[in-house]
Structure formats: C-alpha cells, structure tokens
Swiss-Prot record:
Listed transmembrane segments: 311-327
Gene that specifies this protein: MPS2
Organism: Saccharomyces cerevisiae (strain ATCC 204508 / S288c)
Pfam families tied to this protein: MPS2 (PF17060)
Location of the region described as Disordered in the Swiss-Prot/TrEMBL record: 216-235
Function: Component of the spindle pole body (SPB) required for insertion of the nascent SPB into the nuclear envelope and for the proper execution of spindle pole body (SPB) duplication.
Subunit structure: Interacts with BBP1, MPS3, and SPC24.
Protein name as catalogued: Monopolar spindle protein 2
Cellular compartments annotated: Nucleus membrane; Cytoplasm, Cytoskeleton, Microtubule organizing center, Spindle pole body
Length: 387
C-alpha cells in the first residue's frame, strides 16, 4: 500500500474542515463530518464505475459512536497526530485498515485512485480563503502604507480574522456549555425530587417497622404475663404445699392472738364488774367489813391514781375537820341508826355525806382503771394487726 494515497485522502478530508488560521486540529463535533467527507469520496468513485468497493465504509453502530462522541465532547480538540489513537479507541480498527479493505480484489488503495478523484489539487476553500485575504489586504490598507511588506499586511489580517474566528468559536462553546449546565440543573432537580420521594418512602417504611416492633413487644409481654399467671399450665405444676402451709401457720397465729386478747378483755371486764358489785353492796347494805373493803380499794387503784386520790382525800378531810361538829349534829338529827348498826359500821360510813364522798372517789378510780386497761388492750390489738 502506498502511504501517499491514504495521506492524500486524509489530508483532503481534513482540509475541508480544518482552517489554516485556527491551528492543526478539529473539534469533536466535526468528527462525523470528517467521516462523511471520506465516505462521499468513495461513493463518487463507485458511481464512476472505475472501482469495485465495499460500501458503506462504516456501520450504523460506528456512526452512532461518532455522533455520541461529537455530542459529549463537542469542543474537544482533536489534533492530527492524535486522530489515529482516538479513532482506534472508538471503533477498535484504524482508519487506514478500513479504507484498504474497501477495495475488492486489491490489498491497498490504488495509486491512480488519487488522480481519478482529483485529490492532489488544493481544496477550493483554501484557494478562496487565500484570494479573500489578498483582496482584503489591498482594500483595507491605506495608500500611505502600501510601501510596507505584503507579508506583514497579510499576517496582520490573518491575526485579526483568527481572533474573530476564535471569538465565534468561544461564543458557540459558551452557548453549548450553558445548555449543558441547564440540562445538568434540570437533572439535579429531578434527582432531588426522586430523593425526596425515596426519603418519604424510607420514613414510611421505618414507621411501619417501628409499629411492628411495638406490636411484637406487646405480644411478647402478653405471652410473658400469661406464662406468669398462677392459673396457667406452666405454673400449675409448681408445688404449692409450702405456700399453703405458711398461710395456715400465719392464720393460726393470728387466731391465737385474737383469742388471747379476747380472754384478757373478758377477765378485766369480769374484775371490774365484781368491783362494781362489791361497791354497790357496800353502799346498799353498809356492811362492817370496812378494813377489807379499804384494802381491796387500795389494791385495785394504781399507784399514780392512788397518790392523786390520797391528796384529794387529805384536802377534803382538812376542809371537813373544821365543820365536823356541825355535820355530826346534822347527821344525828336526821339519821339515827340503831346501836347495832353503829357498832358494825365505821365512823365515816355512819355519815351519809362522808360515805357518798368516799364512794365517789372510789368510783372515779375504778373508771380510770377500766379506761386505762381498755386503752392498753386496744393498743396491743392495733400493734398485732397493723391498724
């Protein structure tokens, strides 16, 4: 294969896109156009009938790859020396191999193919561009500067046009980037909406999960309470003899305590009743057993009550000592018992007023004793039963 034939085809197609003033590169968006120019060359050769060719050169999949590259890398600069590597990475075949395999019956591009397609002549774009540059230089340059070198004039015009071209390219690049930014913002907003939707779903799922956990805990608590119930089958098998025996023992102890307190209350009440009967019989019959009654009276009264009663009696006797003669006259005048009864009764029992005073103090001591005894019994009963 002649390297010159492939280079001529490639340079021809490259020159249709690349501008001499912009540098030795094309943009990524121009890649499909470059491939289309090469395909047009081979289609014209097939129409002329000079060569048998395998067309199309590129499949639809490869063309889709070229279009995707041009859309994603619109302003990516493809330099001429980097084109082979970029093309091979896209279709996994070099461009030279694809063009050579297009010819049927030969293994390389025929040398007369270049002449028949008139690929040696410079492109019309380059010729027209050169004519415009020379015309523009002659028109825009003032007469006083015609003495300057034509090369300098052309270089100045080329620099200005190059700058204009670069500005236009930058504007297009900026517009494309702005559109990409808008598209990205739209995608970001959509992603935010989807994220919020997923967050709401996650929150609802988490709430349901917590509700299920709570329901599970409630069921577990109910099951545990059922197992701890004494009537449940798990507890019925436990030996309850010890518990019942303890209950019986405590009940028996409380019953004994109640019986003991009842007996004590009966004894104390019986003693008080007997004391009341004795005092009543003394008041009614005025028996001569004064000393024995006085001893019983002393033993029945507590020590502190006895002291109070003694003080009261002493005070009463001191008061009555001065008026005793008058009392005797009054008593003997109204109450004249027989000689036998006077001998049987004590001197104070023969007096109605003195006997009433003594029996009044004795009744007071009996009532205080009974009240104190009942209070002690009530306190003991309250301590036993925790009242």
């Amino acid at each position: 294969m002649s390297n010159g034939a492939f280079d001529a085809i490639f340079e021809y197609a490259w020159g249709q896109i690349d501008k001499p003033i912009s540098g030795d590169f094309i943009y990524g968006k121009d890649l499909p156009k470059l491939i289309e120019i090469i395909e047009n060359i081979f289609q014209k050769a097939q129409k002329s009938g000079s060569y048998e060719l395998r067309l199309p050169l590129f499949s639809e999949i490869n063309k889709d790859l070229f279009r995707t590259f041009s859309n994603t890398k619109t302003f990516f600069k493809i330099h001429k020396e980097e084109f082979d590597d970029i093309f091979f990475n896209l279709v996994n075949h070099p461009l030279r191999e694809i063009l050579e395999n297009a010819f049927i019956g030969v293994d390389s591009i025929p040398s007369d193919f270049i002449v028949s397609m008139n690929l040696n002549s410079p492109s019309k774009f380059l010729v027209e561009n050169k004519n415009k540059n020379t015309e523009g230089a002659g028109i825009s340059t003032p007469r006083k500067k015609l003495t300057e070198s034509p090369i300098k004039l052309l270089s100045r015009n080329n620099i200005g046009k190059a700058l204009e071209v670069q500005v236009e390219e930058l504007k297009r690049e900026l517009t494309a980037k702005q559109s990409l930014l808008q598209e990205n913002e739209r995608q970001v907003s959509e992603l935010k909406i989807r994220l919020e939707t997923y967050q709401e779903k996650y929150a609802s799922i988490q709430q349901r999960f917590s509700d299920l956990q709570k329901a599970r805990q409630v069921e577990d608590n109910q099951n545990s309470s059922r197992t701890s119930d004494p009537g449940s089958p798990l507890v019925t098998g436990i030996d309850q003899k010890a518990i019942l025996e303890e209950f019986r023992r405590r009940l028996q102890r409380q019953t004994d305590t109640i019986s003991f307190l009842k007996d004590q209350i009966r004894r104390e009440r019986g003693l008080n009743c007997s004391n009341d009967k004795v005092s009543h019989s003394k008041r009614k019959h005025a028996t001569t057993d004064g000393d024995g009654t006085f001893k019983n009276f002393i033993s029945a009264v507590p020590s502190n009550i006895w002291v109070k009663a003694t003080i009261r009696i002493i005070v009463c006797f001191a008061l009555l000592a001065g008026v005793l003669p008058y009392i005797r006259k009054y008593v003997y005048a109204h109450d004249t018992p027989s000689q036998n009864s006077r001998l049987q009764l004590s001197w104070w029992e023969n007096s109605g007023i003195l006997s009433k005073i003594v029996w009044f103090f004795e009744d007071q001591t009996d009532l205080e004793t009974e009240y104190r005894s009942n209070a002690n019994v009530d306190d003991a009963y309250s301590r036993v039963f925790g009242i």
